[in-house]
Amino acid sequence: MTWLEISGTVGRVAACLGFFIAGMAIFYLLTKVIYRIPEKQQLERLHEPGKFRNAGIVIFGGVAAVLFTGFFGMGLQGIIYFLFLAVLTVVTFIDMDTMEIPFMLNVIIFVMGVVSLILQFVSDTVPGSEFLAMDEVTIVSRLIGMICISLPLYLIVLFIPEGFGGGDIKLMFAAGFLLGWKATVVGFFIGLILGGIYGVICLVRRSHGKNDHFAFGPFLSVGLAITLFCGNIIMNHYIDFIKAAMNPEI
C-alpha cells in the first residue's frame, strides 16, 4: 500500500508530511555520518561541511521518502530501497571529498542484497507474508549482476590503472547483487553518460589538468538511484527492440 491509496486528502497529506519528516531525520543523521566514516588519514582532505549542502541533503531525504513510499509502498521493499538510496548518498559525498568509497559501505549494500533475497524467498513460500514481497530478481540475475559491470571494470583497471577506482568496482559488484543485472547495466550506463558530460564540461572549462581525476562514484550512485524506478523497464524495452530489429516481420 502506498500513501496514494490512503483515502481522503487529509490522510494523504498527513502521510506525506510524516514520511517527509522521517526522511529528513534519517538524512540529517547522514550528514553526520558523511564526515565521520572516512579514516583519520583522510580527514585533512575534507573541507568543512557547508550549511547549505547539509540542508540540501536533509531536504532531499524528505522528498525521497515521499517519492519512495508513493512508488514502492510501505512494505520492506520500499524501506530497503530507501536505505540503499541513503547509502548511495553517503557514497556520493564521501567520494567527492576523499576520492575513495569506504569498503564498509559496499558491504552494507551487499548485505541489503542478501536480505532482499531472503525476503523474496519468504514472501514466495510463506502464506500471509505479502508485505515482505520484493521485486522478482532471480538468483541468477543477481549473480550475473555482480560481475556484468564489475568484472569489465576490473579488466580495464588492469590495463589502465587510473581508469576506475577500486571502490567503483566494489560498488557495482554489491549493487549488482541487490538489483540484478538489468538494473545494474542501466544504472551504470546512466552514470557513465552523466560522468562523461561532466568530464566534457571540465575539459571545456579547463578546471582539471590532464592528469587530474574526478570522483566517478557520485555518477554511479545517481545512475543506480534512477534505475530503482525504471531500470528493469528500460532494459526490457531495449531487449524487445533488439529482438524486433533482429526478427523483422516479413
Identify the meaning behind each predicted range.
Residues M1-I250:
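A membrane-topology feature that recognizes alpha-helical transmembrane segments
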